Amino acid sequence: MAGTPAPNSHRKQSGGLEPFPGLSRSIENPPSKRARSFSETTVPDPEDPFGEHAEFTADDLEELDILASQALSQCPVAPRNLSSAHKVRRLDGLPNSPIRKSREDIPVKDNFELEVLQIQYKELKEKLKAMEEEILIKNGEIKILRDSLRQTESVLEEQKRSHFLLEQEKTQALSEKEKEFSRKLQSLQSELQFKDAEMNELRTKSQSNGRTNKPAAPSVSHVSPRKGSSVVLKSEACSPHVGKTTFPTKESFSANTPLFHPCQTEAGHRFLVGQEVSDNKNHSLGGSLMKQDVQQRILADGWMQRKDAQGSILINLLLKQPLVPGSSLGLCHLLSSCPEVPTGTLLQPPGLSTLPGTSGLRTISSSDGPFSPSALREAQNLAFTGLNLVARTESSHDGDMAGRRVFPLHQLPGAVHLLPLVQFFVGLHCQALQDLAPAKKSGVPGDSATHTSCMSSGVEASPEDSIHGLESFSVASLSVLQNLVCHSGAVVCLLLSGMGTEAAAREGNLVQTCADTTSASREDAHDQDQHPLLKMLLQLMASSSAASGHFQASVLGLCLKVLVKLAENASSDLLPRFSCVFPVLPQCLGSALPLPCVLLAVELLSVLLDHDSLAWQLCSHPEGCLLLRLYMYITSRPDRTASETQWLQLEQEVVWLLAKLSVQSPAPAGIGSDCHCNVEAVRALTVMLHRQWLTVRRAGGPRTHQQKQTIRCLRDTVLLLHSLSQKDKLFTVHCVEVLHQYDQVMPGVSMLIRALPDVTDCEEAALDDLCAAETDLEDSEMDCN
């Protein structure tokens, strides 16, 4: 019934809202109080299923409700409401029953429930949107917290790693220091044992000398060492310590030993030497006793000097054994060399008993001349006097140098008396090299005087072996000269003057002589003659740089060290005297030389550039440009035995040398000039900048002192490149050969320097210009292609 509509439903929908006939009649004529019975039989109207005069039953009303609900579900809301309104009017005449009320409340109830559902739907939709927004917010907060947690974990992990590395480095450093301290302790203990044994031996010798030399000569006045009389030492100086069975300490030995006068010591030495030389039957014993007496005298002089004596440091350095690592010779060997004894009994250093150079030392100087035995003996006597004067003289420091040095350089005029001994051995070496040079050219090894003398003495040795032996004495002499130059202002003044060592030794007041030399150098430094020892140094440098070998490199390095210290301690008025060094320096920058020698040559140039007249000689001499040779040595790196740290040190010295050269006014040659070294400077600076940047980038971790110096050198190199780019019009063309390195290094160096806390505006401007020049380089390379 609900699926098929009633027969008259079509009529009701199509014919509009027409009232039922029975219902209208009942409304017009209200029914009687007594209802009709349902048993009355009436003929139903086929068109009216409810009957014409019959009342609606509950089934009819239910059917009407069903029809109305179907009409409401199929028709729009407005027509349904209209039909409902008509139905209400049609049913107004019905009695007030519960069925009628339920029928009237159905549409209102449906509308109300629909509105309630719509309101609830809207509220739920809004709540859903709010929940979605809240979920999105919570998800974002969770993501942010997760990222911050991950970042915090990474930071903590990095801190743990850095802390672990730092602790590991500290532990390693402490272990290395502990090992070093233990090694030093062992070496000091062994040295103390040797000193104890030596003290015991000296004590025994002093007792024996005290017994044999009881008659003492009276003391004499202080005269020149060349005119002093031959006297013996006082017996009190070597008297045995009676009643002392224990080993004496340094303090007790110095306190109980009387203070010698320098002249007495020298005279006593001459007496002992005369006795030993005159005794032809005991040459071997005499040579050994001479060495022991020399060691005893020097050690006693060092212990007996006053605490405030300025020469104590110099004495300790001169008594070091050996003077040079790798060599067995010291000052004692130079002082005890006696060319008059036979070869078998000649005093020789340990391990050099068959050294032909030692016999050459005896036989080369057999005739009269500057290398005669008498000249050696006289030089040794002067050296003894000089040691005594240095140990006891309180010297004043140089006033001119006091303003330039943190620790003023003291005069120590007694140190000048050691120069003849140094000059003897260095000159002997130079003479042997001169004699060997024509023999090498002619191919006849017997032409040299050294070889002839050695063969005549019965020792078969080649000239090369003789030169090798003389080189060891020359190395020891140069070490003595280096110590003298480092601590004596009188030696510095004398070497830079035109006066010879012997002439200076004859002067009464050596300090006044040095002052006169300084004042004369201010007037005309170039017209004075060179000191003979300085000429020998330059000759040794030239010969050693041309040869190859360990001893040649050692001799060249010592010569350069002496010149560096001599230039550092010289006053600005004496620096023009070093103009004689520039013709030899190109040979010291050759590709065959080791890196330490080249580094010393760069240090010497850096000191000499303090004077403007010397700075102009970098590119002016005919042997070649010094800067060009230096650039080629750095870019090629010929010394394969040098470490990376040594190469970085050389590059830093070169950068600082160029920085000093660039700030001089007026600018000398080499920076922005027409010399070919200016073209090579761009390439060399780019290569050095690239290497140093790679070193800093590979290091990582906390920066050490060496890395900080490398960064400082990077900054100076950038400023130098910027200066070259401003002065050189063809800067972009000169950079084409190293364009790949320039493109790689400039962005990294720019980021590194800009990240520093103390970066300057000048450096930032230089980086901007150099990075802008990078694009110009790319354009020029494209044009070349």
UniProtKB/Swiss-Prot annotation:
- Principal localisation: nucleus
- Compartmental location: Nucleus
- PTM characteristics: Phosphorylated by ATR.
Which portions of the sequence form the region Interaction with CINP? 118-156
Question: Where do the segments described as Disordered lie?
Answer: 1-53, 201-227
What are the alphabetically sorted keywords of the record?
Answer: Coiled coil, DNA damage, DNA repair, Nucleus, Phosphoprotein
What sections of the sequence does the record tag as coiled-coil?
108-209
Recorded hits in InterPro entries, A to Z, give: ATRIP (IPR033349)
GO BP term (any one):
DNA damage checkpoint signaling
| Positions occupied by motif EEXXXDL motif | 763-770
User: In the record, what terms sit under GO molecular function?
Assistant: K63-linked polyubiquitin modification-dependent protein binding
Q: Which domain of life is it from?
A: Eukaryota
Q: Name one cellular component (GO) term.
A: nucleoplasm
Q: What is the role of this chain?
A: Required for checkpoint signaling after DNA damage. Required for ATR expression, possibly by stabilizing the protein.
Oligomer and partners? Heterodimer with ATR. The heterodimer binds the RPA complex and is then recruited to single-stranded DNA. Interacts with CINP. Interacts with ATR.
Assigned protein family: Belongs to the ATRIP family.
Q: Show the domain comment.
A: The EEXXXDDL motif is required for the interaction with catalytic subunit PRKDC and its recruitment to sites of DNA damage.
**Could you identify this protein by its name?**
ATR-interacting protein
Task: Please name the source species.
Answer: Mus musculus
- What lineage does UniProt assign to this protein's organism? Eukaryota, Metazoa, Chordata, Craniata, Vertebrata
Q: Which gene encodes it?
A: Atrip
